[in-house]
């Protein structure tokens, strides 16, 4: 069910080859394997080496935006036709450059509990994550995204017992804030990530999307730091493309005053640690140590 839904959007035929670029202990890595089996196509597995070498002969790959940026900047000779992007905001400049080199970019929204992708689309620079794929249902209840799908897990295994995934109404409540417009889902952010500064609510993901639009930004995270006067203030942790820029000046006419970071820090390599996602908790702890 997972593979069928994704491949209803992304062309992947029996002559195509998807690089196993993600670990199989992560649902996104398992998703590559399911799509390979469903399509009767090929899947390439290689020992760890530079990404350009790993992609030799591959038509499809699951990457994070930073990896695709580097391939494009280096004008790497690859045979890619399509890339499924995840893990960070996707700048429109990135997808446009990829399209110029014949690479279609897709993005979406998924969860481990749903065997990965729930909604997806061809990346277009807009904030939404696309429409529900076949076999998936989405609704918004009190600003929270609720889901159910054919690919949904039966539950969690805890203390020798299966704990149901769904609530009394038969839906999985995600704890994600979302909106539906014209059948397309927009993820505003995690309900757990919302914080207040001087009485104003700040959703980190909303601020991150604005900052990520700058061409020098590979990825950015907004972290709340305690403040005696305001309760919390936003700090930005940024991974730059080659060199730093004055983003504080750049965001002045793009973000409300209370949303503008009071401090800009560069993302340290140790927090990336080869993972698919960067831990917000680890970011908070690192920022606190910078004082």
In which residue ranges do the predicted regions lie?
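Residue-level signal for inorganic ion chemistry
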Residues: 61-64, 83, 87, 138, ...
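AMP-binding/adenylate-forming
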Residues: 1-74, 82, 106
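Conserved ATP/PPi-binding loop(s) of AMP-dependent carboxylate-activating enzymes
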Residues: 131-134, 141-170, 200-202
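AMP-binding/adenylate-forming catalytic core of the ANL superfamily
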Residues: 149, 175-259, 271-274, 282
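Short, well-ordered beta-strand segments
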Residues: 17-19, 146, 237
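Glycine-rich beta-strand-to-loop/alpha-helix junction loops that act as flexible
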Residues: 85-88, 109, 148-150, 198-200
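Acidic/polar alpha-helix N-cap and adjacent early helical turns
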Residues: 285-291
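Gly/Ser/Thr-rich phosphate-binding loop
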Residues: 60-63, 71-127, 137-139
